[in-house]
């Protein structure tokens, strides 16, 4: 426990150094939400529950930024700086190392949720029962494991430059095609077919089913679990093969 606490203190210091990045990861989705939701604020025949659903979309967008940029970047930096090798020669085990990374990311997730939810409620008047707010936050955190799996897979790339390029393409592609920026019903049929196969779309389906019907979307849940498990398993296998080569 003491070693895990010490690692978390280090993570906190690193977070302070990357404060500008964290402000952007929360600030940009919040700005998008205020801009696009403002277009529908005074529209009587606007889409039902648009303010609420777009609030959830932009929260997921913010969390995806943390999982696909901050998480892999930190792991890659630790690797090239030999921090991971150093820890292997100390009493700290790698499970504690990864737990500290996950803890740091969970804190980032909670900050994203708190900020974007607060803006939606206080500025745009989004109102839900307390149970719905808590349930939506919980499902966002659990569902975002799929993005963590993607971020971990990015660490297999040989350079930080390539990791950044591929990460940006995935980030924007998943956001647009998966329906975080706009409903995929506006897309041609072939683009809709692609969008429905993406984790961003399935995460939003999970949230919409919970908020609209109070239940769990089983197909979306299974998709996210299988997607995450396959990527985690593939990454662990390839990383092990790479280290033993």
Please identify what each model-predicted range represents:
Residues 4-16, 206-207:
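A short amphipathic helical element positioned immediately N-terminal to and/or at the very start
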Residues 14, 46-48, 127, 178-231, ...:
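Membrane-interfacial helix-loop-helix junctions in multi-pass membrane proteins
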Residues 14-42, 51-70, 110-111, 168-175, ...:
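Hydrophobic alpha-helical transmembrane segments of multi-pass membrane transport/permease proteins
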Residues 31, 51-122, 169:
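Hydrophobic alpha-helical transmembrane segments of multi-pass membrane transport proteins
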Residues 35-40, 155-197, 201:
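Transmembrane helix segments
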Residues 36-45, 65, 120-128, 156-159, ...:
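Short helix-capping/hinge motifs at transmembrane helix termini and TM-loop junctions
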Residues 44-74, 139-152, 156:
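Hydrophobic alpha-helical transmembrane segments of membrane proteins
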Residues 94, 102-166, 215-225, 230-236:
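Alpha-helical transmembrane segments and their short interhelical loops
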